[in-house]
From Swiss-Prot:
The modification N-acetylthreonine is found at residue 2. This is Photosystem II D2 protein. 2 of the reaction center chlorophylls (ChlD1 and ChlD2) are entirely coordinated by water. Belongs to the reaction center PufL/M/PsbA/D family. The lineage of its organism: Eukaryota, Viridiplantae, Streptophyta, Embryophyta, Anthocerotophyta.
Amino acid sequence: MTIAIGKSSEEPKGLFDSMDDWLRRDRFVFVGWSGLLLFPCAYFALGGWFTGTTFVTSWYTHGLASSYLEGCNFLTAAVSTPANSLAHSLLLLWGPEAQGDFTRWCQLGGLWTFVALHGAFGLIGFMLRQFELARSVQLRPYNAIAFSGPIAVFVSVFLIYPLGQSGWFFAPSFGVAAIFRFILFFQGFHNWTLNPFHMMGVAGVLGAALLCAIHGATVENTLFEDGDGANTFRAFNPTQSEETYSMVTANRFWSQIFGVAFSNKRWLHFFMLFVPVTGLWMSAIGVVGLALNLRAYDFVSQEIRAAEDPEFETFYTKNILLNEGIRAWMAAQDQPHENLVFPEEVLPRGNAL
């Protein structure tokens, strides 16, 4: 037996190397350097949302009840945006508005900026987590690239849009019914459904759902029968080394259905990645345009003709009138601080009123 005497040739690890070893260690839930951003931000964003929807009123910012404590349910509770008078203030707890008073900070809408900013950085941390893990196991980074779509939509809707308007007040509040109100607002004040970027977004998301359904059904239909099990998967073995389904059979089937079909898996799966991510990015670009109050597809000639000819009406002119109704009814309720009062004769009336 040989005994080595003397100092180890290994250099002592520095702080960075020690942290790197601990953060990137193989464990049940990977932490990583991205976790230093993801986990605290996700914790604070979710904690702020649960706190706000449970306890905090929107009486001082919107004149509304918005918490479980006030009688709201899961669909009507929300963390509401700050008052319009606070413009684009970050509403820091220690800032000049709240001056360290937590109750006052909640009343002013401080939880909304808290949730929005921590939520944005939490999403970015999640994307970085996918980059980091992909690099660790030597994968391509397409998962992270795909997740840039939801991040772009979140940042454009919750941060860039209100930055282009007069304040955070015009961003969506964090709640189900609150988001519905925001959608109605977008339609009435921006004619959003006729915006080509919205159209591309809808085509991307619904097209992706269609592709996902077709792809899943096709794979199920062409699974190799490799056992005597009774269910769809037969005796499918999760560790089998051979191919699970027949691409050749799938190609023949869709060639007969449509006349064209994907001939290789790489192009097929890239297309399934490209369609929804591009749709989400187009929507985000469109919302940035709305932040600047850009308009799209105003068919003025139809509006003029409809105004001159009582018998001429299109679905477009009908929608324009509906948008005017949304604005007239919504503005006074939605922006109580403006003290808007519309004469009775200008408010649109349905047949039942």
